[in-house]
């Protein structure tokens, strides 16, 4: 079902839908591990990839196929692959395209587990990793080598919301024809930016976050061109990680996507109001948000993003101790990691999501001990602000 000319909300609801035997409106959950062949010959043809069809849910399942079709349509890519987590998506992709002797250029500022994979995981298997500030294109250019296979980054970056010019970076990376640019689009989602349209080769997501949107699923997604997607499915996913998404979880994300556009509108609208509140508050030292004209990446964000997102990071006067006081006194906002849920979530990156970093590595990445990260939810914005206000009063 071709939906690329439809609006984003229509695409999220209708794209990739498969007809089924009973004509159900909701996508059925095909809760099966394996699929029956009509004959031995058919089984042989499917294993030889001479005939389309399902074999085993680790390789594909009708429910997950619909989700894969939807994310491919939303990102305007050729093919999607569903995984059991965001880290499963990242690991399966990297284990497909990398080998010993390859070189990776990545950013100093990454989600903590991604940083650990880059810093401690890949290097154990003979992959060289160089950490730079990817928003500084000269640093990227200077880090490139003949054996650079991957340039990997997030934008906006977790947790300080650094912005990278994807179009300019992709042009630099592709001066080496063997280099792939991989972008984690979890924070922005295809609601705000479509990296593949800006020259990026592969997009990865933690679908746990905004795409599902309800805090009840762990999942990851990859979108890229068909040939590369097939390699990731049949090498990285099938053989290297086995990070398979179950049909039940795929169903939840399919359902969550039906409200994707309207949820993102509310998330972003709430965030803009809260940024204005925090930016004027006397106990707040600094607010990090791409929609602020004072943000170093504001002009780039305005160019490549439809909106500025619903993630806010800020530092309080009084540093970490002030931050702990705030976190421990909130009533409505939930003290929890993750993001993109209907509930507003708040956490302390240095001691939580980014604890794999040493203090020196955090400082180099711009993750201070006093930084607080806020994932703005869908509650009435005046209630979120009232809770933040009473928490700040305790400092």
Q: Where in this protein do the model-derived segments appear?
A:
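Glycine-rich beta-alpha junction loops
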Residues: 17, 31-37, 187, 239, ...
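N-terminal "arm"/small-domain region of PLP-dependent enzymes with the aminotransferase-like
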Residues: 1-61, 69
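Short amphipathic alpha-helical segments
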Residues: 52, 78, 218, 249, ...
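Conserved N-terminal alpha-helix of the aminotransferase class I/II PLP-enzyme fold
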Residues: 39-91, 116-120
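Conserved PLP-enzyme active-site core in the AAT-like
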Residues: 3-4, 12-21, 79-283, 288, ...
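A common structural junction motif
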Residues: 240-241, 330-338, 391-395
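Conserved C-terminal alpha-helix-loop-beta "cap" of PLP-dependent enzymes
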Residues: 284-372, 376
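PLP-dependent enzyme catalytic core of the Aspartate aminotransferase-like
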Residues: 119, 128, 142, 146-149, ...
């Amino acid at each position: 079902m071709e939906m690329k000319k439809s609006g984003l909300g229509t695409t999220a609801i209708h794209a990739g839908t498969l007809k089924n035997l009973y004509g159900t409106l909701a996508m059925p959950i095909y809760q099966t591990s394996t699929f029956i062949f009509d004959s031995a010959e058919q089984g042989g043809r499917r294993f030889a990839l001479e005939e389309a069809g399902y074999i085993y849910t680790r390789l594909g399942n009708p429910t997950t196929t619909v989700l894969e079709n939807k994310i491919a349509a939303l990102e305007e890519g050729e093919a999607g692959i569903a995984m059991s987590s965001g880290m499963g998506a990242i690991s399966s992709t990297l284990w497909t395209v990398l080998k010993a002797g390859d070189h990776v250029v990545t950013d100093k500022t990454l989600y903590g587990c991604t940083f650990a994979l880059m810093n401690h995981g890949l290097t154990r298997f003979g992959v060289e990793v160089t950490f730079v500030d990817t928003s500084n294109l000269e640093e990227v250019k200077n880090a490139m080598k003949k054996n650079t296979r991957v340039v990997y980054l997030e934008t906006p970056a977790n947790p300080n919301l650094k912005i990278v010019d994807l179009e300019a970076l992709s042009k630099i990376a592709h001066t080496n024809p063997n280099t792939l640019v991989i972008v984690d689009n979890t924070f922005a989602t295809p609601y705000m930016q479509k990296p593949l349209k800006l020259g990026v080769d592969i997009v990865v997501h933690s679908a746990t976050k905004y795409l599902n949107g309800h805090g009840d699923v762990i999942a990851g997604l990859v979108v890229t061109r068909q040939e590369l997607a097939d390699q990731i499915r049949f090498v990285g996913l099938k053989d290297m990680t086995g990070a398979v998404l179950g049909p039940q979880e795929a169903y939840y994300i399919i359902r969550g996507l039906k409200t994707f556009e309207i949820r993102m509108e509310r998330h972003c609208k709430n965030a803009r109001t809260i940024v204005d509140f925090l930016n004027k508050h006397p106990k707040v030292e600094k607010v990090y948000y791409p929609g602020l004209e004072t943000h170093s990446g504001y002009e780039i964000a305005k160019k490549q993003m439809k909106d500025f997102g619903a993630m806010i990071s800020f530092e309080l006067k009084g540093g970490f101790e002030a931050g702990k006081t705030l976190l421990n006194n909130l009533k409505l906002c939930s003290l929890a990691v993750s993001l993109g849920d209907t509930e507003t979530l708040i956490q302390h990156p240095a001691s939580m999501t980014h604890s794999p970093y040493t203090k020196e590595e955090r400082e180099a990445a711009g993750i201070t001990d006093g930084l607080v990260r806020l994932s703005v939810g869908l509650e009435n914005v005046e209630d979120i602000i009232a809770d933040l206000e009473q928490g700040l009063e305790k400092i």
